[in-house]
């Protein structure tokens, strides 16, 4: 089963995370037409990268906003719209959760350090070999898709530790979505659409743990949902 992964600079861990649960990878980039991009894939993985343009959610640009790629935004907005129209499974990671939320009608905190009073450090700058270093705790909401996927790996307090490399976050949650995890400072760590086959966005980087498997259930869940697409009569 092929999973479409949006092109980004650091794609290898995403690729490995999908392949290690038995999936095949197809890299999607803005040079593709929409028909070609989605042809033959059973699910979509939205990857990390630069900031989403604030113009997408009707706000002036904060001075901290960096690496905006209008072409990528345009491509991913079209991907998200078509994937949701088809009810293709979606897993959105870091920038991906932000793109998913904004494309579906939500907004973002443009800069956590200056816009979230009392915020934890979320934008850890680490060398490649430390991308799996755990940064802070998060709490999962009960009876959500995320909690069900991670249930066997959670502590008794329904919490787990995650890595963290972001300065933006979901602010207003898109209509139809719900929060499924938060950091102790209230920053949203995951959202999902309970009406979809599988539509989950996470703010941390679970793909960095493909060797050790802490977040393997997220990728297994995506692949299982993608396989159900092809079995649909």
PLM regions with names:
Residues 94:
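Conserved G/P- and acidic residue-centered "switch" motifs that form tight phosphate/ATP-binding loops
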Residues 200-202:
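Residue-level marker for buried hydrophobic side chains located in beta-strands
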Residues 97:
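The feature captures the ABC ATPase H-loop/switch
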Residues 1-91, 101-109, 113-161, 167, ...:
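N-terminal beta1-alpha1 cap of cysteine-dependent amidohydrolase-like domains
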